[in-house]
């Protein structure tokens, strides 16, 4: 027998409470100095931003990565990595997988739902250094570009 149409129109409880007191996942590890030393073998020194030693930046330096552009969601990551190639991204993700470190990929950080903002102390992989327009077809109007390209690149 079919359920009444009333049951389908009833409001469902909203269970999304991602930003309300999200405890750290006990199965994930935090970034430490050993991890930063490994990332330094993969990336240029200017591509590693961290509040941990040896770089020890002030936390305010990471605010643009820990907060969405609307100021609605706020994260608490202490490390931002800015790879330039897909090979570097691959090596970072492999290391984080092996060491059970959480990762948050971040393109242009233009998300309206907070998907690019870390919940806890995950590593942010900022893809801004990969922002390139590879080609443009003037006949069709199509751009072929890398992932973090935003509309302002096309002007």
Region spans (language model):
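Noncatalytic alpha-helical scaffold of FAD-dependent oxidoreductases
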Residues: 1-155
């Amino acid at each position: 027998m079919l359920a009444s149409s009333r049951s389908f129109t009833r409001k469902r409880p909203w269970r999304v409470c991602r930003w309300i007191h999200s405890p750290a996942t006990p199965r994930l590890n935090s970034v430490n100095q050993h991890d930063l030393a490994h990332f330094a073998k993969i990336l240029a020194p200017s591509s590693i931003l961290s509040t941990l030693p040896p770089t020890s930046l002030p936390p305010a330096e990471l605010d643009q990565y820990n907060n969405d552009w609307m100021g609605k969601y706020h994260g608490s990551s202490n490390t931002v990595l800015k790879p330039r190639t897909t090979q570097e991204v691959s090596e970072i993700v492999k290391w984080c997988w092996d060491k059970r470190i959480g990762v948050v990929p971040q393109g242009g950080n233009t998300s309206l739902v907070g998907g690019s903002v870390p919940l806890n102390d995950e590593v942010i992989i900022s893809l801004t250094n990969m922002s390139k327009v590879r080609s443009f077809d003037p006949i069709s109007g199509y751009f072929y570009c890398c992932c973090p390209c935003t509309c302002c690149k096309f002007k």
